[in-house]
Amino acid sequence: MGRLANRAAPTQAGDTMARVDTATRAAARITRVRSRVLDLPLPADFRPAWGRGEVQGSFFVTLVEIETEDGITGVTAAEAGPEAAVAIERFVTPHLVGQDGAAPERLIGVLRDAEVLGSPVYFVEVALWDIVGKLAGMPVYRLWGAATERVRAYCATGEVRTAERRVEDCRRIAADGFRAVKLRFHSDDPREDIKVVEAVRRELGDRLAILVDANQAGVLPGMGGHRQWSFQTAVNVARELERLGVVWLEEPLSRHDYAGLRRLRDRLGTLQLAGGENNHGIQEFALLVEKGCYDVLQPDAVLSEGVYQIKKIAALAEAAGLVVAPHTWTHGIGLLANLHLVASIPNTSLFEFPHEPPGWPASALSQMLVEKPWIDQDGCLAPPQRPGFGFELDEELVERYTVARFG
């Protein structure tokens, strides 16, 4: 009798949980997916180091909202124009409507299939987890374990500038409260870029940790190219940066040159190698870990994989003694998605905070949000505490700069 009684209680509890699960699925059933393409202005011309000869006065963002039966809306965005919205409408919406929006793991296959068809839409998973967080009434990073409440940010610059101007920039950056800065290497002769690092180190000493981004992972289509480094050039630059006490060198070789990256890493002492923003899919990152290419992995939650899939990548990195420090130079929603991600993992370090006035200040990156992220007095960022990813759209601004609608 005792054994039979003990079996009955779990059955009743199971029935209750089943009813709750059924109610949740009904509430989270996806009813609509809509996209708006925005052309967001920059306050001044911006000359990206990774696009020689390019001058940007604005940037495209495709804002995607996934609506559920009970009125909860999950929001995400891609740094892309109408092509992203078309991909969503063709390859994603037909497979999401009617599905359980609170079950992202069941839907990640849809996003991967779209990527196979040439349309990377991993960023959509952010909206699904936004729904989950709002249903649970919790910030996403807390749902995922809340490894920390704050992360140390570094100021990511985006242009190639003279040594004199960059020193002045770095004085301002330090005064703003940052403890680290990332500089760009894109001169035909890397020795010119090394002079900039030398000047910043000489003038600011140890007030700022220095990171360097070579952007050698691949030339972006449609943007001005830059001279690709040979393996020996990467070695020579790395040795000079090591001498100057630089923390890491980012993307010194092609993103798929696994053997070259490992050889380079094996030759270094204190300088770390970082990269991964241009790699896609959990399998590529597993290969980067297996081959020992980097000390620091830099997947982006709206570019590289689904945001929760990157949490899995972080676990692979943790097992190998590596850290994850995401790329975030996209838009404010992407920045916050990555912030929740790193706040939920134990193996992170510095967090990228794009800020290159006058052309690309942090406020421009996050202009479609009501509250613009900024560092605290310790140079750290804290994820928003509201449910989901915790941001609110500036609907007036979004409407003002919307140039196309889908769904």
Locations of the language-model features?
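Flexible C-terminal active-site loop/helix
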Residues: 19, 25-43, 56-61, 331-407
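Metal- or metallocofactor-binding catalytic centers and their adjacent structured scaffolds
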Residues: 27, 32-34, 67-135
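Non-catalytic terminal accessory/regulatory regions of metabolic enzymes
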Residues: 6-10, 15-73, 80-81, 86-89, ...
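Shared catalytic-loop signature of beta/alpha-barrel
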Residues: 86, 94, 254-274, 279-380
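A cross-domain feature marking catalytic cores of carbohydrate-active enzymes
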Residues: 78, 155-158, 183-185, 208, ...
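Conserved, mostly hydrophobic/aromatic
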Residues: 30, 71, 92, 124, ...
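Metal-dependent enolase-superfamily TIM-barrel catalytic cores that perform enediolate-based chemistry
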Residues: 150-263, 268
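Glycine-rich, aromatic-flanked loop segments that form ligand/cofactor-binding clefts
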Residues: 123-161, 207-210
